[in-house]
A protein has these predicted regions:
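Multi-pass alpha-helical transmembrane bundle typical of ion/small-solute transporters
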Residues: 2-209
Length: 209
């Protein structure tokens, strides 16, 4: 039998893996671009002031940049934890992934407003609401993966832990929305509690094979 007579059967799992890799690469690019765009409000400004005065004027924007950068970074890590276990996908999963990426890509805008108007109630509420929506969408995204059993080697306890961890941002940011109407400074200070909640929800998640 010659080589020309050989017909290799397509490997469906190989096609699924390649398609999932494309989803992951595209998602990584969106996360990276969004995190990079966060720095744009720090560029420019008054150049007639001494350097330390320029930095002082940028403190609110530095605050917003640092918080958003680390929150997006946490979601990128969570996205990686989910998709390293995904072995199959459907249009529903792709759509939820796109909705999450939409929220991530949108975040530089409320971040810029939050840094530019640090004492404004509207900018504070808008920022907290934007991150809350991102957190809720991500939770639905993770739930969808778990519900359809697209994890590999993840038990129910671990799945619940991952869903709970995805709620860490909404748990912190949703209550700060009404608080902002009473005291903007307190509301903004509470945002950093997200890292405490994240630590409490950290748990140990077994690596995928």
């Amino acid at each position: 039998m010659g080589d020309d007579d050989l017909e290799l059967e397509p490997d469906p799992s190989a096609g699924q893996t390649a398609a999932i890799d494309r989803i992951v690469f595209f998602s990584d690019a969106v996360f990276a671009i969004a995190m990079t765009l966060l720095v744009l409000p720090l560029v420019g400004g008054r150049t007639d002031l001494p350097v330390w005065e320029q930095i002082k004027h940028k403190v609110p924007e530095l605050y917003a940049f640092a918080l958003s950068f680390w929150v997006i970074g946490l979601y990128w890590i969570g996205h990686h934890r989910v998709y390293r276990r995904v072995r199959a996908y459907d249009e529903g999963l792709m759509l939820l992934n796109l909705v999450e990426l939409f929220c991530v890509a949108f975040l530089p805008y409320p971040t810029a407003l939050s840094g530019r108007y640090p004492e404004d109630v509207a900018s504070t509420v808008f920022y907290a609401a934007s991150l809350s929506v991102l957190g809720l969408v991500t939770t639905v995204h993770v739930w969808y993966v778990v519900h359809h059993r697209r994890y590999a080697n993840v038990d129910d306890r671990t799945a619940r832990r991952m869903i709970t961890r995805s709620l860490s941002v909404p748990i912190v940011f949703i209550p700060t929305i009404p608080i902002a109407f009473l005291n903007v400074v307190v509301a903004r200070s509470l945002w950093w509690a997200v890292f405490v909640i994240r630590f409490l929800f950290r748990g140990s998640v077994p690596r995928a094979d």
